[in-house]
Amino acid sequence: MAIYHLEAKVVSREKGRSAVAASAYLSCSKILNDYDGVQHDYTRKKGLVWQEVFLPENAPTERQDRSVLWNAVEESEKTKDSRLAREFVVVLPIELNKSEWQKLLTEFIQEQFVSDGMCADVSIHDPHPPGHNPHAHIMLTVRPLDEQGKWQYKTEKKYLCVRNGEEKGFTATEFKTAQVDGWEKQ
């Protein structure tokens, strides 16, 4: 019988973490962090079963490379306490095989995150002994991408407005234009 476990974390500079370092560790790879010049080499780490980077359609293709993706994230965040990424650890059912894990994760990530403009870096680990503790690490960008492939704001206020009895929500930027068209905040 499958056992459910989900853990959610935030990768932030305030805690002394780096999105580049986290990605290198989870993908058992070697990545140079352009932000601080530190080379993160986890190529000797064992237990990696599968890894994949998922991008929305509007993402620049070079971000398929996790080094480019996470260095772009590090560059876009300016403060010493920046939230760089969200990380989820999900236990995988031992009753499923590797291809079923991949299919399950791919569908979940596409539907829940990538469809909303988020970039996802996924790794499946099955440490020794194999089949004992299969789990996936899902790293997500904190900022989604807009239609032009640029980082959006982390959180954006929506203003509920009314015009002639009709209600509609606008972001702060959209509201400036909507005011000209007669929309008013409620």
Model-derived segments and spans:
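N-terminal nicking endonuclease/strand-transfer module with a His-rich metal-binding environment
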Residues: 1-186
